[in-house]
């Protein structure tokens, strides 16, 4: 699991100051690029798509900085929300071009996981990623944010705009489906 780098109140304050915004945004980008890239990548799978969505995320974040009024925790949640929307927008565009549902796109992406993993990849990890891509979209989002990004339910609730209890139920169902799916591959 990865941990999300700390975003300090001093960094948030620097982002609000027009004279220091560019330098502060560079620091924010350096701190959050990797976790946001991997959050997006787990949703869209393809490296180039993840790069595009990540770039879009940071452009939208920079453009929206003047309107942002929260603190450090809210900034992290806001960035994840922008990243999630960028990934979902990309998946919807792909869906329109394929005339498929998001779940069908997920199944298509599961096939790509093995292709992109390469010959040296840990087979158990590849199977886990394939199984995660077969989850319904909401469960996939919650599982990725909780398991891979190691975010607390309170942060996930801010990112997805859902109640914590709802997220816990979605995570539980996701884990149960993954256990069943992975056990059938043994």
Name the predicted role of every residue range:
Residues 52-59, 73-85:
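Structural recognition of an alpha-helix C-terminal capping motif at a helix-to-coil junction
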Residues 142-146:
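A short pre-motif secondary-structure segment
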Residues 67, 81-102, 121:
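Arg/Lys-rich amphipathic alpha helix in sigma70-family domain 2
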Residues 1-35:
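N-terminal module of bacterial RNA polymerase sigma factors
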Residues 17-27, 37-56, 70, 186:
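Short, charged helix-capping/linker segments at alpha-helix termini
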Residues 84, 88, 139, 153-154, ...:
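DNA-recognition helix of helix-turn-helix
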Residues 29-47, 63-64, 132, 177, ...:
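Amphipathic, Lys/Arg- and hydrophobic-enriched alpha-helical face
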Residues 2-10, 97-121:
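Internal acidic/polar
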């Amino acid at each position: 699991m990865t941990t999300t780098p700390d975003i300090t109140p001093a960094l948030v304050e620097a982002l609000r100051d027009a004279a220091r915004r560019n330098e502060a945004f560079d620091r924010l980008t350096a701190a959050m690029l990797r976790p946001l890239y991997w959050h997006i990548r787990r949703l869209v799978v393809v490296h180039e798509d993840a790069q595009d969505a990540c770039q879009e995320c940071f452009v939208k974040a920079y453009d929206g900085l003047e309107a942002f009024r929260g603190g450090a925790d809210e900034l992290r949640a806001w960035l994840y929300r922008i990243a999630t929307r960028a990934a979902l927008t990309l998946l919807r565009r792909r869906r329109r071009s394929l005339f498929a549902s998001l779940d069908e796109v997920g199944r298509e992406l599961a096939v790509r996981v093995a292709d992109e993993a390469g010959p040296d990849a840990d087979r158990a990890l590849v199977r886990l990623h394939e199984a995660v891509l077969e989850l319904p979209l909401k469960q996939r989002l919650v599982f990725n944010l909780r398991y891979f990004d190691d975010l607390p339910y309170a942060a996930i609730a801010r990112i997805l705009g859902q109640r914590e209890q709802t997220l816990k139920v979605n995570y539980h169902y996701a884990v149960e489906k993954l256990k069943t799916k992975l056990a059938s591959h043994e």
